[in-house]
Amino acid sequence: MNSNNKRVALQEISNYVSKSLNVKGWVNAQVREISLQNGCSPSDKHFPSQSWHGISSIEESQIQKDYDSFLASPLEEEIVFTEKQLLVDLDVCSISNVQSPNCSVSEFGIAIEESNDNCAEEDEEEELQMRYSADESVSVEYAKEILSHMEKLEIRFMPDYRHMSAQPYYVTEMRASVINWIVGVHTCINLLPESLFLSINVLDRFLSLQNVPASKMKLCGATALFIACKYEEIHPPTVKDLEIVLEGEWIGEDICGMEKYMLMVLQYQLGWPGPVSFLRLLTIVNKWESQLRIMIKYFLEVSLVEQRFSSLRASQLVATCAYTGQSILQEENWSNTLPQITGYDYMSLVSYVHLLLKCLENPFDHHYAIYSKYATPYFHGISRQVHDWIATNTNLMAMDGS
């Protein structure tokens, strides 16, 4: 296999970051501070019972309802998932300067195309295959089967959000700091995006099955990244590399021991497709420009820090980030392509868009490492652009979702 081959659809989205950023040092300090604060009696610190900050009680209920609606045992039940039709209307029912009577406008100002049975459907499958062919890594003839299989796996390998939300409050705080630390390490080592998302999935699934003390959260995070790299990377980091980034807190024997234990708990099942696979598919079909793709990638990484997003499927998370990105960039329409491929319309995503916007309000406290990474020229300073947009659109941020 040629390691120099690039994925055409996402070739500009790598993990480059300026070496001048002291990401690891800042995150290490955060982890140590939270460990000291919660090391004495963490058991009595639980999530507050009031509504989640930043979204309404209706949206809070909707998030839990959406999670419960597709919850299934990954080990005992066969998930039956109907294949979604990939045929899309790419050149019909387009939005012109004069809005079509078949369009509605969302609260974010995006024109939403409604279905029209009279629209022409000429050569849709051929057009879709041509767009798939733009990326050599896509097997066109098996596209529908691959997507159907991915949809099954994304549910099968979801963490148990209800168990995670019942954990002591210090676990949530430590998780956020550890994820910021993982992002910093992942960026410095220059790993694939898939490795980052899989590592958080491994960590969350482990946390939903085991109670982890604060003192071992960082070890679990490093081990989750180690496992994900072995699964995704051609040249994964070594145990010695992890010892260096852990700065002597844990030795190789500790890492290997935790690796064995985590894999045993997870029953060696690591086939989660992750959001990058769905993002690549939607990028090809929708011909998204570089700015929107990078912005979606930024939102996906921000969502890793917020535990409430672990209740979403990978495809649902990508759809949420895509809608938010289109809102900020003032894209002209929310086409039928994304709902037909992912199965989510914009109305089913509004609650999660509000939550994402709330997370983006204060990047320096919520996701400093990710903000710093995407503030670099390599990523077109996309995080600063988003922060400026939020600062000048306080009316959107004040919406309660009603």
From Swiss-Prot:
Q: Which InterPro entries match?
A: Cyclin (IPR039361), Cyclin-like_dom (IPR013763), Cyclin-like_sf (IPR036915), Cyclin_C-dom (IPR004367), Cyclin_N (IPR006671), Cyclins_cyclin-box (IPR048258)
Q: Name the GO terms of the biological process aspect.
A: cell division; nuclear DNA replication; reciprocal meiotic recombination; regulation of meiotic cell cycle; signaling
Q: Which GO terms describe its cellular component?
A: cyclin-dependent protein kinase holoenzyme complex; cytoplasm; cytosol; microtubule organizing center; nuclear envelope; nucleus
Record key words, sorted:
Cell cycle, Cell division, Cyclin, Meiosis
Q: A single Gene Ontology molecular function, please?
A: cyclin-dependent protein serine/threonine kinase regulator activity
Q: Pfam family example for this protein?
A: Cyclin_C
* CDD domains (UniProt xref): CYCLIN_CCNO_rpt1
Similarity comment: family membership: Belongs to the cyclin family. Cyclin AB subfamily.
The record's function comment reads: Required for pre-meiotic DNA synthesis and S phase progression. Regulates levels of meiotic intragenic recombination.
What is the protein's name according to its record? Meiosis-specific cyclin rem1
Recorded source organism is: Schizosaccharomyces pombe (strain 972 / ATCC 24843) (Fission yeast)
- State the organism's lineage: Eukaryota, Fungi, Dikarya, Ascomycota, Taphrinomycotina
What gene name is listed for this protein? rem1
